[in-house]
Curated annotation (Swiss-Prot):
Residues 1-223 are annotated as: TOG 1. Residues 833-845 have a biased composition (Acidic residues). This is Cytoskeleton-associated protein 5. Keywords: Acetylation, Cell cycle, Cell division, Centromere, Chromosome, Cytoplasm, Cytoskeleton, Kinetochore, Mitosis, Phosphoprotein, Repeat. Residues 543-554, 2002-2014 have a biased composition (Low complexity). SMART domains: TOG. The lineage of its organism: Eukaryota, Metazoa, Chordata, Craniata, Vertebrata. Residues 516-579, 811-851, 1077-1160, 1422-1443, 1801-1822, 1949-2032 are annotated as: Disordered. The modification N6-acetyllysine is found at residue 48. One of its GO terms (cellular component) is mitotic spindle.
Length: 2032
């Protein structure tokens, strides 16, 4: 015990250090008493304890420590020297006190820290506390934060430095410990109390939920400025003063002092400056100067990323600014100008005043660039110049600005004035002195008198701002000469201006802070938005637009921005964008109630929280109705959603009410300006309900609506974080499911990949299987966008889970992400000036990978690691490499900065240890994947050394090196490798391995490039040396690479490069070059073109086994079976077979059976399409060779590996031919059961069979041909259409085999060629076979010529390609062949053609030698054949072929141009009549007398025959004149295949089969929609329009009356027609080709359609009529104005003449004319006025004034007067000079009317009234009335005499006689022949019978009276018009002509008919010029071939000026036809 008490004797300081706790406790107690007693703070007593205070606070005994803390507190409070202990004591407190469980200890520790701050040691304390935040013990961290918070609360932000605290805040918010996060939240609230919104930017990236919580807390804070409650010792007096003031109630002065103490914190000051200059890409300054805009863009984008840092470190930015300035000033690409301006803005904002030194250089360039008018460029420039202004002063840039003020460009002047106005707002009276103001005012005063209003307005605004800043007194001297109006305007502008100088410090800073932030941070807080508005409010210019510009900022590349939400908002209005991006301030519940009550019914608000669920439901219904009726601008979204959230809110128990609630949320989000603040009110509730069975769907809908309003990235982040903060697994799984679907709908752009990956990992670790499944599904969707790199993030997962993820990824393999359907509603790609959208079709994943977080690993590449890699000991080197591999593997994705690693790895590529070399290569592969495209900066220093390794002697090392080079090239592209001399230097090395590998690599890569650097030429000399290398493999590789070098460099350059070679070498190399020139592939097409086909509907219809080809409405309707079923069939059948086969397996063969049990061909979705795409893009070798080389075989093997069973592939590529036979036998067996597989792999099967053609074994060849026969039979049954790719890689090799010496093989090949025509157009087969005639093998030539003859015999002349003329000339050449068999074959082929087409063949074959010609003539004589019928084989023997063509709708565009006319007729005859073609020909051979006299039994076919005959004769003549005869060989000789294809398709437009017509229209629409192809339609416009209105008439008369026909089909057809017409009339050059007659008939058809009441009754009828309206407007505006005006006048004339025409029709025609009149002022100069006046003259002649006045409506006369008045007004007296085309001006009143109008307009005094004029006119009328009657009758008789107008003339004569019964027409008949007189009398009798209802003729012809009434007669086209169904009589000459046409079409001779005059000779020449009917122009191109005939017609027409010939023929014709009709009538009645 004695020992224990010894310490009692010790002094206090020793007790305090004693090892016994009791001694220490006693010592501390004594010390405390001592400290309390010492009154003098400078007493020496204090110093004794100076070294002990740390021990006081760090005592190990908790009880003792408490006492020590008390003593330490007193010491610090009173001792003068206490400050010296700050560091160690506070450190002790942090580490040993803050971790104590006792609250008292912690409180004392905090008090000690605060006391140190009070004694002015705040910095040291803060430093130690911040160190404490890094401690691992959360208790310590919490206590440190609490201490800092208390210190800030008590001492204020002036004493406690906020910047270091704010810097660590985000890290604290990420802590796992809730206590730490809670304490961080409290300190953030405290900091916000002191600095307000300056805290927002640093916290933008914390978790959104935490940010939301902070926002809620911040809103609760009082708005009054905070005050410190505790003061430093030096401020104790101030504290005393403050207490005194508080006791006295305070005064203003105290408040003022206090206010001064609260510092104004600038957020900029709180940010860390970032150094960006060193981070610029090394090649930046080269790229910014590059010729390619894409490279310049890449350089600018790299700067754009760097300048997003809000605060930049000072440095030398001169070069960077200079480069950006150059882009702004000189770049022609506006997109890059805007991007460079954006970069300058970022630099100015980030550097602030440090940028001022560069301002003077940049400002003039920007001001000059304002000449650019594109809004996005102007906006970017405005933002840039505004940001730059804030870095300098107006004085500094005044000279530059004033210099631009005199620019002539008004846009520059306007924008400069606006900039001055904005600059003035930042000035004060002191910063805008008179010396500065004077020059600006002088310049602006010039602008207020500018001619451009926008310049004047901008100048007024600038002067008004100056007035507001410096006051009237300072400005008035400069405004002395300004007039009052302008002065008032300046003052008005001045009143509107809001200045910034009053709050300059704060707001300018805020402006700088927040302007860039929306682009740099994902979300912005409420106050930040408020500030942005405050700044931008007074500025109409760029500051207001800043948020809009930035909103679409983050996604940089064109393609990915499109699917996402962010990039697509560009076209929406700016305001809408701001509301989306800006979070509105949170409203209090009172404000919300007030706003809601203003828009909702009162009962609704009251019943929201009713206890009765029915009342709540009724309330919700009212709520919904109110929301539906609200306008977007009036809807208070936040107030409404807060009302919904009001009790019971989301805890609503009734599911019906809850469903309504959720639906209303969705409605509000869709209809209102929904902000993120509103979203935050409801999202928690939605997430809570998403898992609900009844309400889940509604919750998802609401979320989707919110995502559309607030953008998906933000919404998704909120929703997922909320879901995972809950513990409900159902909610979590459903949230992930919703997100999967949302990504597909919105696209992936802007999504925070990192955040989702962490959430998905959480979900994958969940115990609930539904959550895991949902997470895996989400990963699958993300995989679509991110690609294989996504898997890297989940490699650490459990194997079972990883296999599930892999399975999901496998499902998505090959699929492309769907196009976004949401978030792009009003999007138009206006921002992509260079068409960027198409530039990157499939590389969206690369852009998404850019979003993935990349790790900085440079700090891990330490010098130790580098020295390890370079160590002498290989084991240590290996360790170093292992470490590097581990670093890269852990990081997954890395940043390009990798320190000294490239140098270290480069050394290892030359390592003597080959294992290490391989390991290094593996690391380099890893590096390429991890670094991505950024690896390109390491190509020169690390990539080229990899190529050196290709020269290694070991195979495996070379293979690894090649794989590495490919991995790098995949990331970098080839440009970096080919630039410079590095590659040529490698090739120069005489290492055979290196040369082989390098040349092989280049041969693989060069074909895929569109362009290469010029440095490629440097490789050529070394390539030539490789061609002569000793090593054979090197030579072979060099030869293979030669065409690809030539592809890029061209033959000339390559040949020129041989100049330096030795003469012997040169000759050899040149020979090789010639050979390579033949095999040189074309350069790959640009991606835009490549992608345009799949994007549009124009891609060929490829067979898709997995899904029915429903893209085309026609082809899908003809598909007999849906493809999915087919796809399943083989699987089932093969399983069934295998089950049977496996009943009794022997053990030895079990494995083999299992291997062979499955299908032999595997259906790979889109596999064939991908292979075609690869071949087209030259990614693989094109299947084109003379003999198959190894690389082709290897390529085919590789392609087959994915879709052919392995065991079969082994057989197919076995070296033994017996295995080939075995493979073919298996393929034959599986042919029927695996149709889909065969079709899916058809291209590969055919290629493999071509290889078999080169085998010498006959049995294999026979087996292959047997298989081919079966294969093509199957394909034709399946109606499959061979693709171009399949055909071109197979047919040439098959054609070679036709020359085999064995007859049996030749016979089989011919049979196969014959069957191929069932699956591939004969016209496309023709060129392949024609190519075969050029062979050296005479047997092949002979067989090919025979096959050509068969094709012509079967399919007609149009099968000949490119034209019959060229084809026959080539065939005729072989008549002179040395081989007899070839000569005979050529002669037989031409004889075949002769048998089909007669003597025309001699014109086509051209000049033959006398010998050849005599041989041909002799052969023709010997054949003893008259020309027979055209090929009927295609109808009779090839029905399958016809179906195949029609069913493959998409192929018609490319499809066969052969045999067009015959196919068209065949289609018509098959659809319209069941009879065969021969029966149609017998129609004109009927013996009518025999039929008439035959009263016995009728032959079974007679009724059909007669009925057919009647229909065909008396229905309107479908094919007028001889103009649609079969397309003759002459036509093909003159026109290309394209023209004939278009003719064929146009002919199908008028088809009676709706599907055929729709197909044709679809194809034409494709052509019209592509600008580069639309020109192909030129010259076919009339033909196309005729076919179109023929179809319109057909629909009107036939289809609409057909009850069996689906009306939807008719609507579809109408839609196609109208869509086509609109496309056509949007192309002005094509629209102007339409002629008058065609336009007239087209307008007739369209107006008839608009008036069709049957259409209005259909469901979509109104839409059709609206579309027609639109089309009519297009026709009127875009057609040739003369033609359309003329057409309308003629149409009006016809409609007024026609008795059956409705008034409504005429009215619509007149409306069209009125529209044309309105257009006249703009179009008068382009109109042929002479022609129009001639048409008006004819109109006025037919309708004199009296007759017009008799019309029921006054509109016709008003229309005519208006038209003439407008013409007079526009042309003046010159109009009278345009009557040149009128022969007899007295025939109408036109000239008199024009004279009156001119006289009236020129009479200035107005003395002559209109009445006098009219009286004068009436006197003239009276004098001429008698003459008029005679003229009128003469006109009628001329019409009767004219064949065209005979019917109309008779009708008019009948009307005239009926009206004027006493009229004498004898004088007119007296001079005519007896025939003519009897014809007129009989015609009048017939009309009388018709009018009185005795419709004998009508009924006998089978034409319904209804059709008579509905059809409007068109007098100018009675014979030829399709719609002519009103029972007109038609002369037999018409039938004779039709017979002639039909005979010619069928290939019959017409020579016997030559004595009959042609149809046109039977027509009299019309007395007045009439508009040629549209159908007269059909096939107008044939006119050149009928020149001789036309001359004959002209002579006939001239001779027919008198009536005699016409009338005789006419009357005899009528007599004959009447007789014919009567006889037919008797036949019919006798059969009844």
């Amino acid at each position: 015990m004695g020992d224990d008490s010894e310490w009692l004797k010790l002094p206090v300081d020793q007790k305090c250090e004693h090892k016994l706790w009791k001694a220490r406790l006693s010592g501390y107690e004594e010390a405390l008493k001592i400290f309390q007693k010492i009154k003098d703070e400078k007493s020496p007593e204090w110093s004794k304890f100076l070294g002990l205070i740390k021990k006081f606070v760090t005592d190990s005994n908790a009880v003792v420590q408490l006492k020590g803390l008390e003593a330490a507190l007193v010491y610090v409070e009173n001792a003068h020297v206490a400050g010296k202990t700050t560091g160690e004591v506070v450190s002790g407190v942090v580490s040993k006190v803050f971790n104590q469980p006792k609250a008292k200890a912690k409180e004392l520790g905090i008090e000690i820290c605060l006391m140190y701050i009070e004694i002015e040691k705040g910095e040291a304390v803060q430093e130690e506390l911040l160190k404490g935040l890094d401690n691992k013990n959360p208790k310590i961290i919490v206590a440190c934060i609490e201490t800092l918070r208390k210190a800030l609360s008590e001492f204020g932000s002036k004493i406690i430095l906020l910047k270091p605290i704010i810097k660590v805040l985000p890290k604290l918010f990420e802590s796992r410990e809730k206590a730490v996060r809670d304490e961080a939240k409290l300190i953030a609230v405290e900091i916000y109390r002191w600095i307000r919104d300056a805290l927002r930017p640093p916290l933008q990236n914390i978790n959104s939920v935490q940010l939301k919580e902070l926002e809620e807390e911040w809103v609760k804070l009082p708005t009054s400025a905070p005050r410190p409650t505790r003061f430093l010792r030096s401020q104790q007096e101030l504290e005393a003063k403050l207490e005194q003031q508080q006791s006295a109630g305070g005064d203003a002065e105290g408040g003022g002092d206090d206010g001064d103490e609260v510092p104004q914190i600038d957020a900029y000051e709180l940010l860390e400056a970032v150094e960006i200059l060193s981070k610029l890409p090394k090649d930046f300054y080269d790229k910014i100067e590059a010729k390619k805009w894409q490279e310049r863009k890449e350089a600018l984008e790299s700067v754009e990323v760097l300048i997003k840092n809000p605060k930049l470190e000072a440095g030398d930015y001169a070069d960077l600014v200079k480069a950006l300035k150059k882009v702004v000033g000189k770049d022609t690409n506006v997109m890059l100008v805007a991007l460079a301006a954006k970069c300058l803005t970022g630099l100015a904002v980030g550097l602030r005043k440090k940028f001022g030194q560069y301002a003077g250089h940049v400002v003039p360039t920007i001001l000059e660039k304002f000449k650019e008018k594109k809004p996005q460029v102007v906006q970017a420039l405005q933002e840039a110049i505004d940001a730059i202004f804030l870095t300098t002063t107006l004085q500094n840039i005044s000279e530059d600005v004033l210099a631009v003020m005199d620019n002539k460009n008004p846009t520059i002047k306007q924008q400069t004035s606006l900039f001055i106005a904005r600059s003035f707002r930042h000035c004060t009276a002191s910063t805008l002195p008179k010396s500065l103001l004077k020059p600006f005012c002088a310049a602006l005063l010039k602008h207020i008198n500018d001619s451009a209003p926008e310049v004047r307005d901008a100048a007024f605004e600038a002067l008004g701002t100056a007035l507001k800043v410096v006051g009237e007194k300072a400005v008035n001297p400069f405004l002395a000469d300004v007039d009052k109006l302008k002065l008032d305007k300046i003052k008005e502008c001045s009143e509107k201006v809001e200045l910034i100088h009053g709050k300059k410090a704060g707001l300018a800073a805020d402006k700088k802070e927040f302007k860039p932030l929306p682009g740099r941070t994902a979300a912005s807080g409420a106050a930040g938005d408020k500030d942005t508005k405050d700044i931008s409010a007074p500025k109409p210019g760029p500051l207001k637009k800043a948020p809009a510009a930035k909103a679409g900022g983050p996604p940089k590349k064109g393609k990915p921005a499109a699917p996402g939400g962010a990039g697509n908002t560009g076209t929406k209005n700016k305001k809408g964008l701001e509301t989306k991006e800006i979070v509105e301030p949170e409203l209090s519940i009172e404000v919300c109630e007030e706003k809601a009550s203003a828009v909702l019914p009162p009962t609704c608000i009251q019943l929201l929280d009713s206890s009765n669920w029915k009342e709540r439901l009724a309330c919700m219904e009212e709520f919904q109705k109110a929301v539906e009726l609200m306008d977007r601008t009036e809807m208070p979204c936040q107030a409404l959603v807060r009302m919904l959230a009001k009790k019971p809110g989301w805890k609503e128990t009734n599911f019906q009410v809850m469903q309504m609630k959720l639906h209303i949320v969705a409605l509000i989000a869709q209809k209102g300006n929904f902000s993120k603040t509103s979203a935050q009110v409801v999202l928690d509730g939605l997430v809570d309900k998403i898992g609900d069975v009844k309400c889940g769907n509604n919750a998802k809908e609401a979320m989707t609506a919110i995502a559309e309003a607030c953008m998906l990235p933000w919404t998704a982040e909120q929703v997922v974080s909320m879901a995972f903060s809950q513990k409900n697994p159902k909610n979590q799984s459903e949230t992930l499911n919703w997100l999967s679907n949302a990504i597909k709908e919105f696209g992936f752009s802007g999504l925070n990949v990192k955040a989702f990956i962490s959430n998905v990992k959480t979900a994958l670790a969940a115990t609930n299987p539904a959550v895991r499944t949902a997470a895996i599904t989400l990963l699958g969707v993300m995989y679509l966008y991110v690609g294989p790199s996504l898997r890297m993030f989940f490699e650490d997962e459990k194997p079972a889970l990883l296999s599930q993820i892999d399975a999901e990824f496998e499902k998505m393999q090959g699929q492309s992400p769907p196009a976004p359907t949401r978030g792009i509603s009003k999007h138009s790609t206006s921002g992509t000036d260079e068409g960027e959208d198409g530039d990157e079709p499939d590389d969206g994943s690369n852009d998404v990978v850019d979003l993935l977080p990349r790790t900085e690993i440079s700090d891990k590449i330490t010098s130790e690691l580098v020295s390890k890699i370079g160590d002498k000991n290989w084991k240590i080197r290996k360790e170093g490499l292992d470490e590097v591999a581990g670093i890269i593997n852990d990081a997954k994705f890395i940043q390009p900065n990798i320190g000294e690693l490239p140098t270290a790895l480069k050394g290892r590529l030359n390592d003597s240890n080959k294992i290490l070399v391989q390991q290094t290569l593996n690391i380099l592969q890893q590096l390429a994947v991890a670094m991505g495209p950024n690896i390109k900066q390491h190509v020169k220093n690390l990539g080229i050394p990899i190529i050196t390794v290709l020269g290694d002697s070991k195979n495996n090392v070379r293979a690894a090196a090649l794989a590495t080079v490919n991995a790098w090239a995949e990331q970098t592209g080839m440009k970096e490798w080919l630039e410079g001399e590095d590659l040529s230097e490698e090739l120069k090395k005489e290492n055979p391995f290196l040369r082989q590998e390098l040349l092989g690599w280049l041969a693989e890569k060069l074909p895929t490039l569109r362009s290469t650097p010029t440095d490629l030429i440097l490789c050529v000399p070394h390539l030539y040396s490789c061609l002569e290398d000793r090593n054979g493999d090197v030579r072979k590789k060099a030869q293979d690479a030669l065409p690809f070098f030539m592809m890029h460099l061209g033959y000339e350059k390559m040949a020129k490069a041989t100049g330096k070679l030795k003469p012997t070498s040169k000759d050899q190399v040149l020979a090789m070059l010639e050979k390579a020139k033949v095999n040189m592939p074309a350069k790959p097409a640009p991606p835009t073109k490549a992608t345009s086909k799949p994007m549009g509907g124009s891609a060929p219809a490829k067979f898709q086994p997995a899904s029915a080809p429903a893209e085309d409405c026609i082809s899908s309707s003809t598909e007999p079976k849906p493809d999915p079923k087919k796809a399943k069939a083989p699987g089932l059948s093969s399983k069934a077979k295998s089950a049977q086969g496996k009943k009794m397996p022997s053990k030895t063969s079990l494995k083999e059976d299992e291997d062979k049990s499955g299908p032999i061909f595997i259906v790979v979705p889109n596999g064939k399409e991908q292979r075609m795409k690869d071949e087209k893009g030259l990614k693989v070798l094109k299947w084109n060779f003379t003999t198959p080389r190894d690389e082709y075989i290897e390529q085919l093997k590789t392609q087959m590996s994915s879709c052919v069973a392995k065991w079969l592939q082994d057989e197919m590529f076995h070296s033994d031919f017996q295995h080939h036979n075995k493979a073919l036998a298996v393929m034959v067996d599986h042919l029927e059961s695996e149709k889909e597989g065969v079709i899916g792999c058809l291209d590969l099967i055919l290629k493999w069979l071509t290889l078999r053609f080169f085998d010498t074994n006959t049995s294999v060849l026979m087996k292959a041909l047997e298989y081919l026969k079966l294969l093509f039979t199957l394909l034709s049954e399946e109606e499959y259409h061979l693709t171009e790719n399949e055909a071109s890689s197979f047919i040439p090799y098959l054609v070679v085999k036709v020359g085999e010496p064995k007859d049996v093989i030749r016979k089989d090949v011919r049979a196969i060629l014959n069957r191929m025509c069932l699956v591939y157009p004969a016209s496309k087969m023709f060129p392949f076979i024609m190519e075969g005639t050029k062979s050296k093998n005479s047997k092949q030539r002979a067989e090919c010529l025979e096959e050509l003859g068969c094709l012509v015999e079967s399919y007609g002349m149009n099968v000949c390609q490119p034209t019959p003329g060229k084809a026959l000339k080539e065939i005729a050449v072989h008549i002179g062949d040395r081989d007899n068999a070839v000569r005979n074959a050529a002669l037989n082929t031409i004889v075949t053609v002769y048998n089909v087409h007669g003597d025309q063949v001699f014109k086509l074959i051209g000049n033959l030698s006398e010998k050849d010609m005599s041989m041909l003539e002799e052969r023709i004589k010997r054949s003893a054949k008259r020309p027979s019928a055209a090929p009927i084989k295609q109808v009779e023997e090839k029905p399958q072929r016809a179906q195949n063509i029609s069913s493959n709708a998409n192929m018609l565009r490319k499809g066969p141009a052969e045999d067009m006319s015959s196919k068209l007729n065949q289609a018509r005859s098959m659809s319209g009549h069941p009879e065969a073609a021969q029966m149609v020909r017998r129609e004109f051979q009927l013996d009518l007398d025999e039929i008439e006299n035959d009263n016995g039994t009728v032959r079974c076919e007679m009724p059909e025959l007669v009925q057919h005959k009647l229909d065909d004769i008396f229905e309107p003549v479908l094919i007028p004149e001889p103009k649609i005869r079969a397309v003759s060989p002459h036509f093909d000789d003159m026109h290309s295949n394209t023209a004939s294809t278009i003719n064929f398709i146009i002919s199908q437009v008028a088809s009676g089969d709706i599907n055929t017509s729709i197909q044709a229209l679809t194809q034409i629409d494709e052509v019209l929609r592509q600008e580069d192809k639309a020109e192909a339609m030129s010259g076919h416009i009339d033909q196309f329009l005729i076919a179109t209105f023929m179809q319109l008439r057909l629909i009107y008369n036939t289809h609409m009356a057909d009850e069996k026909l689906e009306k939807d089909e008719i609507i579809k057809l109408y839609s196609c027609i109208i869509g086509n017409m609109i496309s056509l009339f949007q192309i002005e050059s094509l629209a102007r080709e339409a002629s008058t007659g065609v336009l007239k008939d087209l307008m007739h058809g369209l107006i008839t359609l608009m008036l069709d009441s049957r259409i209005e009754d259909l469901e979509e009828g109104q839409q059709v009529i609206r579309s027609v309206n639109l089309l009519v407007v297009k026709v009127l505006e875009k057609s040739d104005q003369t033609n359309i005006l003329s057409a309308l006048l003629v149409l009006l004339q016809d409609s007024l003449l026609a008795t059956a025409s409705s008034p409504k029709f005429s009215e619509l025609v007149m409306k069209c004319l009125w529209r044309m009149v309105r257009l006249l002022p703009d179009t008068i100069n382009s109109i042929n006025l002479d022609r129009i006046l001639l048409d008006i003259h004819i109109f006025m002649k037919v309708f004199p004034k009296e007759k017009l006045k008799q019309c029921k409506s006054e509109f016709p006369i008003r229309t005519l007067k208006t038209l003439l008045h407008t013409l007079c007004k526009l042309k003046g007296p010159k109009i009278l000079d345009h009557l040149t085309m009128i022969d007899n001006k007295n025939e109408s009143e036109l000239e008199a009317h024009l004279c009156r109008m001119m006289k009236h307009s020129m009479d200035q005094t107005g003395s002559k009234s209109d009445k006098e004029t009219e009286k004068g006119a009436s006197r003239i009328d009276e004098k001429s009335s008698k003459a008029k009657v005679n003229d009128f009758l003469a006109e009628i008789f001329k019409k009767i005499g004219s064949k065209e107008n005979t019917k109309e003339g008779l009708a008019e004569l009948y009307e005239y006689k009926k009206k004027y019964s006493d009229a004498d027409i004898e004088p007119f008949l007296k001079n005519s022949s007896q025939f003519f007189q009897s014809y007129v009398e009989r015609g009048l009798r017939v009309i009388e019978m018709e009018r009185e209802g005795k419709g004998r003729i009508s009924t006998s012809t089978g034409i319904s009276p209804q059709m008579e009434v509905t059809c409007v007669p068109t007098p100018t086209s009675t014979v030829s018009s399709i719609g002519n169904t009103n029972g007109e009589e038609v002369g037999p000459s018409v039938y004779l002509e039709r017979l002639k046409i039909l005979r010619q079409r069928c290939g019959l001779d017409n020579t016997k008919q030559d004595d009959r005059p042609p149809l046109t000779s039977l027509l009299s020449k019309p007395a007045v010029p009439t508009v040629a009917s549209s159908t007269d122009m059909l096939h107008s191109k044939l006119s050149q071939l009928r020149e001789s005939r036309e001359q004959h017609q002209h002579s006939d027409l001239d001779s027919n000026q008198t009536h005699s010939s016409g009338t005789v023929t006419s009357s005899s014709s009528t007599a004959n036809i009447d007789d014919l009709k009567k006889r037919l009538e008797r036949i019919k009645s006798s059969r009844k």
